Curated annotation (Swiss-Prot):
Phosphoserine modifications at: S134, S138, S318, S320
Glycosylation sites: N99, N156, N176
Name this polypeptide is given: Alpha-2-HS-glycoprotein
Recorded GO CC terms: blood microparticle; extracellular matrix; Golgi apparatus
Keyword Transferase applies: no
Tissues expressing this chain: Bone marrow.
Gene expressing this chain: AHSG
Protein species of origin: Cavia porcellus (Guinea pig)
């Protein structure tokens, strides 16, 4: 009897090994311009823009690499490398990304470089790992295209800080509504001719009227209405001329900032730039991940020409157990049977350039 039971076990074991290989359990290398690859990359760009706390929104420019891994028990993960370009829409602007203009080379463009892992499950995309950096175009390349165009200058430059404060004071003097205070200086350029300072900055409304802006109590939270200003402060004999235009965004309810795989986190309003914020304003807490080791989202450095995308994400992976680092492959069981005869040439990558390359 024992021999018969053992024989049945061996038969079942042999049957398991002789089962045909199930397709779809191996790594795939789709084309960078494949519609599904682009959909995964666009999901990554949306995730990026949801987490940008300073500076500007970004758009997809080019997909450099893609690998697709199966994920047990279901779904698959797109391992992506793609480039982005900075737009003229501020991170707090509610304008749809499709309506945002890409910053041109003559405006000193900024390029982003992202590594993301995007999970596709039940037809839905979600980001499980994200890492991005961004750099402005080189000064030499800008000069080749436009020798006289002004270049980016550090936002803590004394002329830049003065221009932002002077422009904000002029806006508050003309504004009959709420008093606004400086939230961040987003970018700046020193213009040689005519001698002037161009600055773009974000503002936030206080609970006081513009006429009462000098009252210390006017700095109290909550601050739910933001605006974005563009200003030029021209140097004149015996003084200066200030030109400023501000767009005030509709009041938005404070919503929780999404995290990969629905990991919960606190969501305070964007933190003010410590280099330009009023001394009396309270420090704003930054995001912290609720699960696992506590790691915070560090503010960008004070001396900078742009807001690097590296400060958009906390230094932590997804709270999901399926998340993995940028160079760590997910655990995959590869079949023991060859899937094809001979080496298969990789599909075309990188993909097309949607705007321009810098």
């Amino acid at each position: 009897m024992k021999f018969f039971v053992l024989f049945l076990c061996l038969v079942q074991l042999w049957g398991c090994h002789s089962t045909p290989v199930v397709l779809g359990l191996e790594e795939r290398n789709p084309a960078c311009d494949d519609p599904e690859t682009e959909a995964a990359a666009l999901a990554g760009v949306d995730y990026l823009n949801q987490h940008v706390r300073w500076g500007y929104k970004h758009v997809l420019n080019q997909i450099d690499k893609v690998r697709v891994w199966p994920r047990r028990p279901s779904g698959e993960v797109y391992e992506l490398e793609f480039d982005t370009l900075e737009t003229t829409c501020h991170a707090l602007d509610i304008t749809p990304l499709a309506n945002c203009s890409v910053r041109t080379v003559t405006q000193h463009a900024v390029e982003g470089d992202c590594d993301m892992h995007v999970l596709k499950q039940d037809g839905q995309f979600s980001v499980v790992f994200a890492k991005c950096e961004s750099t402005p175009d080189s000064r030499e390349d800008v000069r080749k295209v436009c020798p006289q165009c002004p270049l980016l200058t550090p936002v803590n430059n004394t002329k830049v800080v003065h221009a932002a404060n002077a422009a904000l004071a002029a806006f508050n003097a003309q504004n009959n509504g709420s008093h606004f205070e400086l939230l961040e200086i987003s970018r700046a350029q020193l213009v040689p001719l005519p001698v002037s300072t161009y600055v773009e900055f974000a503002v936030v409304a206080t609970d006081c009227a513009a006429a009462d802006g000098t009252d210390p109590a006017c700095s109290g939270p909550p601050k739910k209405q933001y605006g974005f200003c563009k200003a030029t402060v021209a140097e004149k004999l015996g003084g200066e001329e200030v030109s400023v235009t501000c767009t005030v965004f509709p009041t938005q309810p404070v919503a929780p900032l999404p995290q990969p795989d629905a990991a919960s986190s606190a969501n305070p309003p964007p933190a003010a730039d410590p280099a330009v914020s009023p001394p009396s304003s309270p420090s704003v807490p930054v995001d912290s991940v609720a699960l696992g080791p506590k790691r915070v989202l560090l503010p960008p450095p004070v001396h900078r020409e742009h807001y690097n995308l590296r400060y958009s994400f906390p230094d932590v992976d997804s709270a999901s157990g399926e998340a993995f680092g940028p160079r760590q492959k997910p655990k995959v069981t590869h079949p023991g049977v060859a899937s094809g005869v001979g080496p298969v040439p990789p599909p075309p990558c990188p993909g097309r350039i949607r705007h321009f390359k810098i």
